[in-house]
């Protein structure tokens, strides 16, 4: 089973991945962007704001996604696989493009493979503002709360567009409570 953990920056994806690693030590864990050697280089470019045009940014994400699919996801499809982000985030971040065209491009990059299930960690504006105030920002986080809240909505929209079963949880719950809901209410149900 391929499970993607989605949400905007600071929502707790990394914390949940760490808890899932302890709970499922035999599972495969990856992230997007950056789940391959090429992906790490592309991630640095993307988070550093090196891509100045929206088209260049989109193409870098798609290159990472295709490489990640070939080297990490496809070989692990018969195992329990957790990914910190997926094509859903890539589509959500690619604002300003036709959604059906984005879907086609991303499905081309993934060879039609999408997560079996998606967990979306959702933040309120107040909680997001607080969490952002507690850390330094990369080029995406520096776009601000309004941008990230819009992105959060797009993550939900892209999940629906792809028709993937999802579980949306409040990221303001304790990490342990979120973890329990992911495991009992979603992952273990198969």
Swiss-Prot record:
Q: Which UniProt keywords apply?
A: ATP-binding, Kinase, Nucleotide biosynthesis, Nucleotide-binding, Transferase
GO BP terms in the entry: dTDP biosynthetic process; dTTP biosynthetic process; dUDP biosynthetic process
The UniProt catalytic activity note for this protein reads: dTMP + ATP = dTDP + ADP
* GO MF, one example: dTMP kinase activity
Q: Which domain of life is it from?
A: Bacteria
The protein's Enzyme Commission number:
2.7.4.9
- UniProt cross-references to SUPFAM superfamilies, sorted A to Z: P-loop containing nucleoside triphosphate hydrolases
Q: Which residue spans traverse the membrane?
A: none
Q: Is Protein transport a UniProt keyword of this protein?
A: no
Against CDD domains, the record matches this protein to: TMPK (cd01672)
Q: Where along this sequence does the record place binding of ATP?
A: 7-14
The answer to keyword Transferase applying to this record is yes
Q: Name one GO cellular component term.
A: cytosol
A Pfam entry, by short name? Thymidylate_kin
Report the HAMAP family cross-referenced here. Thymidylate_kinase
Q: Which family does the record assign?
A: Belongs to the thymidylate kinase family.
Q: What does this protein do?
A: Phosphorylation of dTMP to form dTDP in both de novo and salvage pathways of dTTP synthesis.
State the protein's name: Thymidylate kinase
Say which species the protein is native to.
Wolinella succinogenes (strain ATCC 29543 / DSM 1740 / CCUG 13145 / JCM 31913 / LMG 7466 / NCTC 11488 / FDC 602W) (Vibrio succinogenes)
């Amino acid at each position: 089973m391929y499970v993607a953990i989605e949400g905007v920056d600071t929502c707790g994806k990394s914390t949940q991945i760490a808890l899932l690693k302890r709970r499922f030590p035999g599972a495969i864990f990856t992230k997007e962007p950056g789940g391959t050697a090429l992906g790490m280089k592309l991630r640095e470019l993307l988070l550093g704001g090196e891509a100045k045009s929206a088209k260049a940014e989109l193409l870098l994400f798609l290159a990472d996604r295709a490489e990640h699919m070939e080297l990490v996801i496809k070989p692990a499809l018969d195992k329990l696989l957790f990914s910190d982000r997926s094509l859903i985030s890539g589509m959500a971040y690619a604002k300003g493009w036709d959604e059906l065209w984005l879907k086609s491009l991303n499905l081309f990059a993934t060879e039609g493979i999408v997560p079996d299930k998606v967990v979306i960690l959702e933040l309120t504006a107040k909680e997001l503002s607080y969490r952002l105030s507690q850390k330094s920002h990369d080029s995406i986080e520096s776009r601000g709360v309004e941008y990230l809240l819009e992105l959060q909505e797009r993550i939900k929209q892209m999940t629906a567009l792809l028709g993937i079963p999802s579980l949306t949880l409040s990221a303001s719950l304790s990490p342990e409570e979120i973890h329990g809901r992911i495991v009992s209410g979603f992952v273990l149900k198969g």
